[in-house]
Amino acid sequence: NGSHANLKVIGLSSGRQVQGIDTRVTNYGNNSVGHILQHGVILERGTLTFNGIGHIVKGAKGADAQQESRVLMLSDKARSDANPILLIDENEVTAGHAASIGQVDPEDMYYLMSRGLDQETAERLVIRGFLGAVITEIPVKEVRDEMISVTDTKLNKR
């Protein structure tokens, strides 16, 4: 009772890479909290699918299950799906989900480039900001630093 689970997920798909990321949080106890936050970026011909399941079992009164899945596509050849699933077996609960898939606003890119940034640097800033919204939520500094390092390494291979 009163337990908390907060999943933070980032995905970065490039080239012809295909990624499917499945997350699941099950609320068993009263007043338990299960939150899933997922952000992904797709470059080139990459494919990224987020499948998130929030499950509140019978008897878990006052439980809270929330999901947010957001994907940013940086190519018209990129493919993505965000599939939030809520399985609710109790009445007195709170549950919700949000999902969005979109491209970088051309006006944002124009603004950054009008300030002297080349397209690659502007894209990198947009990607870091988008994924940073999840990375900054990770409570363990070493894990945050590793996520930043892995992201930078992947972006530098482009």
Whereabouts are the PLM-identified features?
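Conserved beta-strand/loop scaffold segments within soluble protein domains that form the structured core
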Residues: 1-110, 114-117, 138, 142-158
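Short arginine-rich
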Residues: 130-140
